[in-house]
Amino acid sequence: MIYHFTEEYDIIVIGAGHAGVEASLAASRMGCKVLLATINIEMLAFMPCNPSIGGSAKGIVVREVDALGGEMAKTIDKTYIQMKMLNTGKGPAVRALRAQADKELYSKEMRKTVENQENLTLRQTMIDEILVEDGKAVGVRTATHQEYAAKAVIVTTGTALRGEIIIGDLKYSSGPNHSLASINLADNLKELGLEIGRFKTGTPPRVKASSINYDVTEIQPGDEVPNHFSYTSRDEDYVKDQVPCWLTYTNGTSHEIIQNNLHRAPMFTGVVKGVGPRYCPSIEDKIVRFADKERHQLFLEPEGRNTEEVYVQGLSTSLPEDVQRDLVHSIKGLENAEMMRTGYAIEYDMVLPHQLRATLETKKISGLFTAGQTNGTSGYEEAAGQGIIAGINAALKIQGKPELILKRSDGYIGVMIDDLVTKGTIEPYRLLTSRAEYRLILRHDNADMRLTEMGREIGLVDDERWARFEIKKNQFDNEMKRLDSIKLKPVKETNAKVEEMGFKPLTDAVTAKEFLRRPEVSYQDVVAFIGPAAEELDDKIIELIETEIKYEGYISKAMDQVAKMKRMEEKRIPANIDWDDIDSIATEARQKFKLINPETIGQASRISGVNPADISILMVYLEGKNRSISKTLQKSK
């Protein structure tokens, strides 16, 4: 095939949503010449659904992206209207930060970053085809018949792939927020031999702020204590003048309106055929599935400081517009609310993720990567996490460097990608803390400790950032050593002070670290006995120290499990293995192995339907093959 390339790039990224911007920024910062192509520049890093970043598990992903050298955390720290730490009354493993975003400002701020990034070209164009030669991605062709060469292509098209919006009996071709759908590229991905699925998501109506009666709703303010997503943000820049959200509920009348109109609901008439998200169902789905519930929470979330639009969180729907209006007016506080936008469902094509490697490169086509909702996930944060990994690995591949694979013990990003490529997904995938078996070591407070060194090694963490990280790490290490070296003895004077503070007296000598391990004792209590650290420690380091010490036993057990799994991950499976050549493994295991083609024993062990006996047989088979190869090599010598 002869192509007429008018421009040449190292990497072309298709789609400028949250996955696309992270992929393109990472690759360009690693020295690659990158083209970021988008159908509509005005929608760069746009939030077509909820105007927020973070939340349970998701907030930790944002910090992981930041630790690796990504941009989402920095951008939301510049553009939030409210910041809140969730689950503060629970254990450290499930705490996470959530921000209400000024969605227009967020998009503009990210666009400014992209436009000012060296090596990165932003262009509004529609990509119709990925050009492939000898099993390798070599470029793209646009709708205007321009051909651009590339050594790698990353598809981050979100819900635009053959997107269709559904409102009642109305169904039309569209991407998110009534943008153009990408039809030809969807066809092209099928023609390239990729297996394609069909998913669905939705969004609620938006109402006018000045038409809401806030007096009958419950105010939900942000936090006064400074918190940030990015480890580079400063407490003195924390926004105190925050915009509150408001809580209201559906009621019996709301439910009756929905029940009376189920015959007009696309979810139940067969119009919607795509699989929807389990953890973010439409309101009509909730009313049917949870018929015993008298009410459902709804959060009224402002979409920015300079807009009247308010997002009705929890009211996602594709009901006809007239039904949506009646439904909105049945809700306390929204009796006279003006609906500014109608809720809708959107169906879209996605690439079944079992076809991907852990680098997010497709197994079928070398140099073709996919990330974000294209891979079947939901959420801006999940998209950003995949985007930065795809961008990093595309850059490493064309630079001839070792790939970056995040393990399940490295971060929630690693958990997500492993789930996708090992188990696949039959519905839009959402990250949850319950998906992570090592969640006590994958906390919001230690993402930088886990991943900054990786970001530095690949070139995404600059000298200034690295110097700040080293200072923090040294302060943490030094204080942990100090606490372990100082002894508190059960002498009269010490115990008098211990009892005065309301604690049980000491019966044996203990280190300051052991004393801090007591649930009721805080770091400041310990300092009252041993004095402050040589260098003043900020609250974030103190939080990290307390968590590491108080949960040391559990963390140690988790690390033992990590070491065991690491040994299994180090046992590679040859890419050309003949699964039919292995005797005695169960039929289901053989079928799953053929479908997923696991790269390591560890990955093989996590495939659903594969039992320990199958893994044992596989390991015996591989050991036999290795012995056979060794004997052959010895004979040839």
UniProtKB/Swiss-Prot annotation:
Q: Which GO terms describe its molecular function?
A: flavin adenine dinucleotide binding
What does the UniProt entry say about where the protein is found? Answer: Cytoplasm
Q: Which residues bind FAD?
A: G15, A16, G17, H18, A19, G20, I127, S182, Q373
- What biological processes does GO assign it? tRNA methylation; tRNA wobble uridine modification
- One Pfam family matching this protein: GIDA
Instruction: Name the HAMAP family for this protein.
Output: MnmG_GidA
Q: How does it assemble?
A: Homodimer. Heterotetramer of two MnmE and two MnmG subunits.
Q: What does this protein do?
A: NAD-binding protein involved in the addition of a carboxymethylaminomethyl (cmnm) group at the wobble position (U34) of certain tRNAs, forming tRNA-cmnm(5)s(2)U34.
Protein name, as recorded: tRNA uridine 5-carboxymethylaminomethyl modification enzyme MnmG
| Upper lineage | Bacteria, Bacillati, Bacillota, Bacilli, Lactobacillales
Encoding gene (name): mnmG
